[in-house]
Every structure is written in C-alpha cells, then in structure tokens.
UniProtKB/Swiss-Prot annotation:
Tissue note: Widely expressed.
Phosphoprotein is among the record's keywords: yes
Keyword set, alphabetical order: Disease variant, mRNA processing, mRNA splicing, Nucleus, Phosphoprotein, Repeat, Retinitis pigmentosa, Spliceosome
Phylogenetic placement of the source organism: Eukaryota, Metazoa, Chordata, Craniata, Vertebrata
Protein name per UniProt: Pre-mRNA-processing factor 6
Native organism: Homo sapiens (Human)
Function per UniProt: Involved in pre-mRNA splicing as component of the U4/U6-U5 tri-snRNP complex, one of the building blocks of the spliceosome. Enhances dihydrotestosterone-induced transactivation activity of AR, as well as dexamethasone-induced transactivation activity of NR3C1, but does not affect estrogen-induced transactivation.
List of residues that carry Phosphoserine: 143, 279
Top-level taxon of the source organism: Eukaryota
Sequence positions bearing Phosphothreonine: 180, 266, 275
GO terms, molecular function: identical protein binding; protein-macromolecule adaptor activity; ribonucleoprotein complex binding; RNA binding
Subunit and interaction comment: Identified in the spliceosome B complex. Identified in the spliceosome C complex. Associates with the U5 snRNP particle. Component of the U4/U6-U5 tri-snRNP complex composed of the U4, U6 and U5 snRNAs and at least PRPF3, PRPF4, PRPF6, PRPF8, PRPF31, SNRNP200, TXNL4A, SNRNP40, DDX23, CD2BP2, PPIH, SNU13, EFTUD2, SART1 and USP39, LSm proteins LSm2-8 and Sm proteins. Interacts with ARAF. Interacts with AR and NR3C1, but not ESR1, independently of the presence of hormones. Interacts with USH1G.
HAT repeats: 384-416, 418-444, 445-476, 554-586, 588-620, 622-654, 689-721, 723-755, 855-887
Compositional bias ranges of the Acidic residues kind: 66-78
C-alpha cells in the first residue's frame, strides 16, 4: 500500500459534504455546464420520457403548474377578518366581470377613504400640534427672546463679553511675534552705506552695534569697516520729506474732486470728509460690469456716428447716474459741438450745467437754433427775475411770432391790461388759435368781446368753443333769449362748414357750462344735440343713460334738461315721469317735485305711484289737507285702487284720525276687498287694542283669503299675545297646511315651541320645513341658531356646514358662519365668504362688524359705507352703522348716518323688522326706529 496515498481517496463522500467549503471556496457554473440554448419544442435528454414530458416547453408548463399549486393555505396565513393573505382565485382567469368588481371595490374604498379623510386629517393635525407643544423646537423656545433682541442698544451689544475659549493655555495664548520699531540709526547707516537692509544682523544685537569684533576672536576692528568709500550715500536714497509732500498732494487732489458740487462752489467740511464721500456714492442699481458694457457700447456708437444726438444724450445720462457729473457735462458739451442743430442735445446740456453756465449754454443754443421754441422756454425758466423772463420771451417772440406757446407764456406774466394788449397782437400773429381768441374775449368788455368772438368765428369757422363762449357771454350779460339762437346757429354753421356734430363732445361742453354756472347755455346745448345721431327706438333708453351719466358727473342742470326734453317727446310715458320725479326728489326742491308731479298726473292719471308721491310730499311738508285732496283726485282717476285706499288710510291713521281710517277701510273692503285691505283693517284694530274686533276681522279675511300667510301670522300672534299658546300653535299649523312654503310661518311656529320649552319639537318642525322648502337659507339659519341658543355649538357648526353645502351662495348664512368661528379663524372665513358672495350686503355687513371687533375703525367705516351703498333697504346695516358711529364717530357723522337712513327708508332686515313691526312701535318714525334698533345691539361679536 502506498503510504503517500490518502486513505479517504476513492471513498464515497460523507452526507452533506461540499467540496472546498471548508477553505471558503464557492461553486460556479459556466456555459459549458449548461449547454446550448434550447427551444421550447426541443426534446429533452430523457428520450424515453412519457408523452407530455418530452420537450422543454412541457417541462416549463409542469413547473408553472407546480408553482400555482404551491399556495400557502396554512392556518398561520389565515386571518379571521381578511381571510388568506393571498387570493384564493389568483390562478383563475381574469375576466371582464372581475375587472368591474375590482373597479367597484376600488370606488368603495376611495369613497370610504374620503368619508374619513377630513376626520383623519383633523386628528393628524391635532396630534402634530400636540407633539409640537410637548416637544417644541429650540428655535420656537427662543423666539420670544429673539424678538427682545430688538430692544438691545448698540452700547449693550458692544459691552457683551467675548465667548470663552476652552482650548488649552498653549493654544489660547500663542506667542505673538514681537515687532520692534526700526531705530533712526539704522536709516542713517543705510543712507551712509547705500545698502538695502531687510533685517538686523544678529551680531549687531548681540555685541551692541557696528563695532563688532572680528570672528577670529581678536579685538581688531573689521578690516575696511571705517573706509571712507563706504560713507558715500547710495543710489537708493529715501527722502522722507518728499514722501510726506506727495501724500499731502494726493489728499488735496481727492478733496478737490469731492468738493466739486453742482453749483461749482467748494462746500467740503474736512471733519465730515467720510460723510461727504458716502453721499457721493452713485445711486444707480446696475452692475459695474453692465455699466462698463454700456459705456463701451455708447462709445462705439459715438465714434461710428458722431452726429447722432441720442448717442451723446444717452452717454451723458449714463455718466450722470453713475455719479460722474463732470464727465457727463464734458460729454454733452462735446455733443453740442458735434450736433449743433440738435434741440434735444442743447436742452440736455442746459439741464446738466449749473445755473450761470446753463444760461451761457442756452445763449449759445439760441445762436445755432434761433427758431427753437423749447430753447426759448428753457431760457425763460432759467431766469429768476420776472423782468428778465419777460425780456427773454419778448426776444423770442421777435424771432418766432407765430408760436402759441410763447404767446401764452408771455401773457401769463403780464398784468390784465398789458395782457389784453399783448393778446390783441397775439391773435393777429396766430389767428387760428382758439385759446388766444377766447382769452382776449374774457379780458375785453361786453361789446368788444362780441366783436372779438365774431372775428374769431370768421378766422376759425370750424370750432364749437367760440360759439359756446359767445352763448355764455350773452347769458352772463342777461340776454338769455339770445343763448338758444346762438347755439342753433352754431349747429347750422358748423354743419355748413363740414364739421361733424359729435354728440358726446357737446354733452361734455354742456357739463362744463353747468359746472361754470351757465345754466341757460348748458340747457340750450342739451336741447340742441340730445337727439342727434340716435335711432328713434333707442331714444328713451339713451336719454335715461345720459341723464344718469350727468348726475354721476354732478351736472344736475344737464340732467334736468334731458328729462325735460324727454318728457316733451314722451309725455305719456309713466317710467320717464317717474325717473324725473325721483331725480327732483333726490336733487331738487320740494316745490320743483310737486310741480313736476302735478304735470305728471295730468298726463298719466292712471299712474298710482305718481299720485302717491304727490300726496306723500304734501304730507311730509305738513300740509295734510292738500294730501287728502290729492288722494281724493286719485280716487276719481283710480276708483278701485288698493294702493290709493291704503295710502289714504295711512294718512289718516298717522294723523290720529282713526275713525276716518276705519270708515275708509270699511269702504275699501266693500269696493276693493283685497287681502292687504283686510290685513290693514286687522292691524288698525290690533294697534288700537280692539282684540275682539281684530280677531273677527281676521276670521272674515281668512274665509276669503285662506292662502294669504300674513293673516295666519297675525292670528297666531294675537293668540300668542293673549298667552293662548295652544290656539296660537293651532293657528300656525292651519296656516302651514294652507301655505306650506311660507318661511315666516315656519319660523313663528318653531319659536313658539322653543319659547314654551319644547326644543325637540322645535327642531322637528325646522327639519320638516327644510324638507318641504329645500335650499331655503332662512330655515337653515334658524336651525343653526336654535342649536346655538340651546348651547349645542358642535351641532350648530355641523348644521352650518350642511347649510353652506346646500346653499353655497347665501350671504346671510356666510355672515352667520363668520361669527360661529373662533376669533383667529374669522378672517379666513370672511375671505371665503367674499369669494362666494362678493356683493351680498349681509356679507359686507359681517366684514364691517369683524373690523369693528378688531378696533380697525377706518376700515370698518369704509365697509359700512359699502354695505349701505349696495343695499340701502337693509335696515340692519343702518342700525349697526349708527351704533358704530355712536361709539367711534363724531356728532356730525352720527347725524349724517341718521339723515341718510331716513331718506333711504329701509324696510327689511331681521333686527329692523322685529322693531318696526312691533305693535308698540307702529307710529314710530324712521329715525326713532333706528335709535331703538341700535339700542338693542350689543358688541358681542
């Protein structure tokens, strides 16, 4: 047996043996081990395999099937809620119905996620805020301290000690290099020897100077050390005196540069040298490189085309903005040499030069350009003395006598008499200047002015201003009958000379005449041009727009003339009479209004509103008999008019003539038995405390008009006043059966239940009302307030969110939602409200109240003005505005708000109606109601 042969060779390997594993070797596979690639249809090596297993494709299918069957259906992979982790049917075919099912499940998941999204985001937000409160950042911890750093003064900053150094002593206290000043003896030796020394010989410091012994140890002086040749001054002599002189010269040059001001005076303060330097910093904002590029570019333009004026002007302005004023002056003067005929270059040179130099520049410019008006004007501006200005302008007029600008400038400096003489010459030199002719006419007497204007018409037959001035002249001298003729002749003459009559321009001229006080002229112009260029069917609409435009421009006489002309053309148009009446009511006198209304009812006797306006005007003036007579005439023209009957009743009841009012109502019920007549009859008895009569009338009215909700409301309120809650509830319920869409009825029934403590029933009533009247903001608002009054703020907020989803454009809901929010969130909510309801008066009122609560008085007043301007009929806005002025305004502002409210006569508003429709306040005036409503308002928002 061979001893070298290992005994385990040829023996089978033990179980689990991997060759080379003990020494860290790993196995690998090469291409030769795998063999060539095979197709799926190639036969496998096992040629005797059964059918279905002979090809590579068969083997792959077999392996895939084995993988599909190898699903983990163990108990450990099973969950009671979700089932197995994998899909039990993943091996099955994925068909169209599977795809639809997956889409449905995905939509459900998405929907469920959206339902919880708001709550989840809120919870995450709260958790983040809680985490930040518990573990604030270092930056947040020191934020309040950092704000206090603004209070630290500069002295306190400087007194703060330096931060301590924690390094060791060797690092903290390094040995600084000791610098010793060079002694004068060193310079003296240098001057004597002519050598350049940069350091001191160590032997000199050791042995004390120049008598250093020879290194060999002997005391013999160094050979040649005292040789006379070494005493010769060297070529590098340093003259300290000359260095000091050069330094002083350099400083003088810098001071002289800084001291050059615009006026050429030396104003440098040596102590404030640095301050002066700072003031000379250029004020331009460009980059230095950009300025250099611009300078090079402009230089190239100047060199390429030296006779191009804009290049010189641009170059000078570039140097000016960079602070190099003298360079700019030099450049522009060079430009005047290269472009002596350029007006702009000379004007720029005069602008850049100081006073006296600028005058010299302008004088030189006049020699080159004796016809330039702008240069003469600039020369006059440079003069400070009036006589010098006159002299310059007169000299200019000798060279340019046909310049209107020069004449106007010269006339402005003269006294009236001299100006008249000068204008006489001016119109000869400039006969086509309308301004000069009109100026001369203003300075002349009446007779001479007429002659001047006639000459002006001969010279300028195409200008309308001359004719209008002539008309104003006649009106100013009392010849009003000539005004109409002059304007008519003006239209005829201008058309004959081929001038197109521009209606808009003439209306503007009429407005100017109105503002100047020439009433007859403005009315004549309006009558002459108001119908020019308008189609017949558009006349009424266009004229009403013109009248509104004149009112907006504060040209009231023009508007009055338009209405007068329109009433001549349309005498039977009720709308035109009404617009004219409202115009007189707002901008005219009571006499003019009554005169207009008398004419109006004569042309439109069937227009009830015109009769009523006339009667009301008389009543407000205290003339009750005249008001009665007007209403009597109105009865004759309109025998069965409900409005006139009720106006007559109101007139009598307001003047405490209750029996006459009862008789009128009885006649009205017999001749014009309308629901409103019955309602006024019930109210009259109610306010007189005749409850039995009021109830009888109410029952009679309901037999005729059971679908009129106000009658049911009055019946319920009368029962409620008598503390008969069951009968009141019954009345409201009966009314709701007949009028299920009446919001006030639902609100009265709900408040009745709340009043007697039936909160659940009140809530149910409001829910029922919202079902019968969807998208009703008033019902949603009452539901929110009901929960808020009950102390259930969370439910109130939830209801408000639902209300805004159903009624996203309701201003009254948004205004309530603003004040349901906490104070920090109100501003954001108000922005959202303004985006949704930009012009809603309730939202504007809420924003005004928000600014009021934040003590932003000016902004609050501005928003109150916006609110009452958008809707002057909202009484709540006036009440809040008046309350605001009572607290923060002056007496004049309070009185102004009260007067505006009385003229607006508001009729709507939740708080306003609660007071104005109260039986106890039925005879109160608008001003009294305003004070009562303002008194009920509390600053709790």
């Amino acid at each position: 047996m061979n001893k070298k042969k290992k005994p385990f060779l040829g023996m089978p390997a033990p179980l689990g043996y991997v060759p080379g594993l003990g020494r860290g070797a790993t196995g690998f596979t090469t291409r030769s081990d795998i063999g060539p690639a095979r197709d799926a249809n190639d036969p496998v090596d096992d040629r005797h395999a059964p059918p279905g297993k002979r090809t590579v494709g068969d083997q792959m299918k077999k392996n895939q099937a084995a993988d599909d069957d190898d699903e983990d259906l163990n108990d450990t992979n099973y969950d009671e809620f979700n089932g197995y982790a994998g899909s039990l049917f993943s091996s099955g075919p994925y068909e169209k119905d599977d795809e639809e099912a997956d889409a449905i499940y995905a939509a459900l998941d998405k929907r469920m996620d959206e339902r919880r999204k708001e709550r989840r985001e809120q919870r995450e937000k709260e958790e983040i805020e809680k985490y930040r409160m518990e573990r604030p950042k270092i930056q947040q911890q020191f934020s309040d301290l950092k704000r206090k750093l603004a209070e630290v003064t500069e002295e306190e900053w400087l007194s703060i000690p330096e931060v301590g150094d924690a390094r060791n002593k060797r690092q903290r206290n390094p040995r600084y290099e000791k610098l010793t000043p060079v002694p004068d003896s060193f310079f003296a030796k240098h001057l004597q020897t002519g050598e350049n020394h940069t350091s001191v010989d160590p032997r000199q410091t050791q042995f004390g100077g120049l008598n250093t012994p020879y290194p060999g140890g002997l005391n013999t002086p160094y050979p040649g050390g005292m040789t006379p040749g070494l005493m010769t001054p060297g070529t590098g002599e340093l003259d300290m005196r000359k260095i000091g002189q050069a330094r002083n010269t350099l400083m003088d040059m810098r001071l002289s540069q800084v001291s050059d001001s615009v006026s050429g005076q030396t104003v440098v303060d040596p102590k404030g040298y640095l301050t002066d330097l700072n003031s000379m910093i250029p004020t331009h904002g460009g980059d230095i490189n950009d300025i250099k590029k611009a300078r090079l570019l402009l230089k190239s333009v100047r060199e390429t085309n030296p006779h191009h004026p804009p290049a010189w002007i641009a170059s000078a302005r570039l140097e000016e903005v960079t602070g190099k004023l003298q360079v700019a002056r030099n450049l522009i003067m060079k430009g005047t040499e290269m472009c002596p005929k350029s007006e702009d270059v000379w004007l720029e040179a005069a602008r850049l030069q100081p006073g006296d130099t600028a005058k010299a520049v302008v004088a030189q410019a006049v020699r080159h350009l004796p016809q330039s008006v702008r240069i003469y004007i600039r020369a006059a501006e440079l003069e400070t003395d009036i006589r010098a200005k006159k002299r310059v302008l007169r000299k200019a007029l000798e060279h340019v006598p046909n310049s209107v600008r020069l004449w106007k400038a010269a006339v402005e400096l003269e006294e009236p008499e001299d100006a008249r003489i000068m204008l006489s010459r001016a119109v000869e030199c400039c006969p086509t200047s309308v301004e000069l002719w009109l100026a001369l006419a203003r300075l002349e007497t009446y007779e001479n002015a007429r002659k001047v204007l006639n000459k002006a018409r001969e010279n300028i037959p195409t200008d309308r201003h001359i004719w209008i001035t002539a008309a104003k002249l006649e009106e100013a001298n009392g010849n009003t009958q000539m005004v109409e003729k002059i304007i008519d002749r003006a239209i005829t003459s201008l058309r004959a000379n081929g001038v197109e009559i521009n209606r808009e321009q003439w209306i503007q001229d009429a407005e100017e005449c109105d503002r100047a006080g020439s009433v007859a002229t403005c009315q004549a112009v309006m009558r002459a041009v108001i119908g020019i260029g308008i189609e017949e069917e558009d006349r009424k609409h266009t004229w009403m727009e013109d009248a509104d435009s004149c009112v907006a421009h504060n040209a009231l006489e023009c508007a009055r003339a338009i209405y007068a002309y329109a009433l001549q053309v349309f005498p039977s148009k009720k709308s035109v009479w009404l617009r004219a009446a409202y115009f007189e009511k707002n901008h005219g006198t009571r006499e003019s209004l009554e005169a207009l209304l008398q004419r109006a009812v004569a042309h439109c006797p069937k227009a009830e509103v015109l009769w009523l306006m006339g009667a009301k005007s008389k009543w407000l003036a205290g003339d009750v008999p005249a008001a009665r007579s007007i209403l009597a005439l109105a009865f004759q023209a309109n025998p069965n008019s409900e409005e006139i009957w009720l106006a007559a009743v109101k007139l009598e009841s307001e003047n405490d003539e209750y029996e006459r009012a009862r008789r009128l109502l009885a006649k009205a019920r017999s001749s014009a038995p309308t629901a409103r007549v019955f309602m006024k009859s019930v109210k009259l008895e109610w306010v007189q405390d005749n409850i039995r009569a009021a109830q009888d009338l109410c029952e009679e009215a309901l037999r005729h008009y059971e679908d009129f909700p106000k009658l049911w409301m009055m019946k319920g309120q009368i029962e409620e006043q008598k503390e008969m809650m069951e009968k009141a509830r019954e009345a409201y319920n009966q009314g709701l059966k007949k009028c299920p869409h009446s919001t006030p009825l639902w609100l009265l029934l709900s408040r009745l239940e709340e009043k007697i403590g039936q909160l659940t029933r009140a809530r149910a009533i409001l829910e029922k009302s919202r079902l019968k009247n969807p998208k009703n903001p008033g019902l949603w608002l009452e539901s929110v307030r009901l929960e808020y009054r009950a102390g259930l703020k969370n439910i109130a907020n939830t209801l408000m969110a639902k209300a805004l989803q159903e009624c996203p454009n309701s201003g009254i809901l948004w205004s309530e939602a603003i004040f349901l929010e906490a104070r920090p969130q109100r501003r954001t909510k108000s922005v959202d409200a303004l985006k949704k309801c930009e012009h809603d008066p309730h939202v504007l009122l809420a924003v005004a109240k928000l600014f009021w609560s934040q003590r932003k008085i000016t902004k609050a007043r501005e928003w109150f003005h916006r609110t009452v301007k958008i809707d002057s009929d909202l009484g709540d806005a006036w009440a809040f505005f008046y309350k605001f002025e009572l607290q923060h305004g002056t007496e004049e502002q309070q009185e102004e708000v009260r007067k505006r409210c009385e003229s607006a006569e508001p009729r709507h508003g939740e708080l306003w109606c609660a007071v104005s429709k109260d039986i106890a306040n039925w005879q109160k005036k608008i001003g009294d109601i305003l004070r009562l409503v303002a008194g009920r308002i509390k600053n709790t928002f």
